[in-house]
Amino acid sequence: MKFLKVAVLFFGLAAAFAVRAQGGTYPVSGRVIDRLSRRPVAYAAVVLAGQEQKGASTDSLGRFRIERVKPGIWRLAVSSVGYKSLTTPEYMVSAATPFIEVELEEDAAQLEAVTVRPSPFRVTAESPVSLKVIGLREIEKSPGSNRDVSRIVRSYPGVAFSPVGYRNDLIVRGGGPAENKFYMDGIEIPNINHFATQGATGGPVSIVNADLVREISFYTGAFPADRAGALSSVLDFRLRDGNAEKQTFKATLGASEVGLSGSGHIGGKPTYWFSIRQSYLQLLFKLLGLPFLPNYIDGQAKVKTRLSERDELTVLALAGFDNMRLNVDEKGEDAEYLLSYLPRIRQETFTVGASWRHYAGRHVQTVTLSHNYLNNRNLKYLRNDDSSEDNLTLRLRSVEQKTTLRAENRTYLGRWTVREGVEVNYSDYTNRTLQRLYTDRTQLSDYRTRLGIVGWGLFAGAEYASADKRFTASAGPRADGGGPPV
């Protein structure tokens, strides 16, 4: 009873402090630059979307600061003479509000004043009807999603999910879970879930920390030509940049995990983001009396620096470590049935990549190098007795690796946008499976294989938009191939 009173008092005080904290205001600061020249845009108007009376103008260095903004999710509406008006993605305004960098595109035909009208929809010439942009508000407030983007998109037209309710296997337009592609700041991610099914893209828990996400583009058709291998859908994550003004840190305690994230700058130009999470599902599942005890750790990091006025370098890393052991002490008919066939599972996966971008007037060149790795291991003993190797029924170790180099160029020619690129990759797969099968006699299967494949891709595309934006067109071919296994 005493413990209950202390708990009620603790949560009451926490709620009171939370309500009091929400009553404060915070500044929103950032910088407005030209998208191609990377030079600051002076005297641009920056206002809160939906609250045009509250805003600021940029100074000669393109910097702005809006004071006394209420906490919550906001977008900025930015306009300047000679540039196309822009509404930014959604940002969370709090004590850890990020430094916001806005890129404006020139509009030489604009010679008179404009009125900024933010639209909740985004239409591109490349994917006019099959693109859905997921903002911060939808990530935070989607019911039942637990800030997991794979669960958010389940409610979209044409999207189904695995009949096993706890998994994030997406079935888009009648396809399969293996037909979805994931990209993060232009770098391919093979899977964004813990305890993944090898060869597919599902899993029960997302590796991606939503705190680092700026917005997500979800394509269900008309895929961009530079996204290889997409058959059903593409989820393209764009991450936030680190805070260029101050160091901020955040600790979280969730229903199944604890986490620590931070953002800031290193010296002058480089900015960083990082996130580390550790689950305590093993403790919860043991208290609930479940026969399996999953545990996971994941981490993300992003570093971005300006090498010069026209050159940027971004380094990205994403890693997940999964471990599911068996609770062999659990008794009962259901538990014994599950323990009879569930193996012990260990997985390690990571992706690391670097992207260099050069702005050369109307041309933007991007070179991306990335490597992803998956190590999947299953182990099972007869009656879960590992005292003797004679009881071994399954030992599996499967490793997948892929290294990708991609170079592309995008040219802006007034109403035309032209892009072209090339991609080279090398994939390596190894498998060693030792399995004992029980039929009318005992059979021992020892399977070993190794496979390496060199692949390539060529893509190009062009987009056109009329002066009044009433007519847009886009077309882009892509060719992929590969050499014989090595």
What kind of region is each of these model predictions?
Residues 304-322, 343-486:
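Face-selective signature of the C-terminal outer-membrane beta-barrel domain
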Residues 23, 109, 163, 230, ...:
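Transmembrane beta-barrel outer-membrane domains
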Residues 21-113, 117, 124:
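Periplasm-facing N-terminal accessory domains of Gram-negative outer-membrane beta-barrel systems
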Residues 133-135, 201, 290-295, 329-339, ...:
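Flexible, surface-exposed loop regions and adjacent strand-edge segments
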Residues 84, 89-92, 97-100, 117-223, ...:
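Periplasmic N-terminal accessory/gating domains of Gram-negative outer-membrane beta-barrel systems
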Residues 73, 148, 167, 203, ...:
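Transmembrane beta-barrel architecture of outer-membrane proteins
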Residues 77, 105, 152, 173, ...:
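Transmembrane beta-barrel domains of outer membrane proteins
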Residues 181, 215-226, 232-240, 247-291, ...:
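Predominantly transmembrane beta-strands of Gram-negative outer membrane beta-barrel pores used
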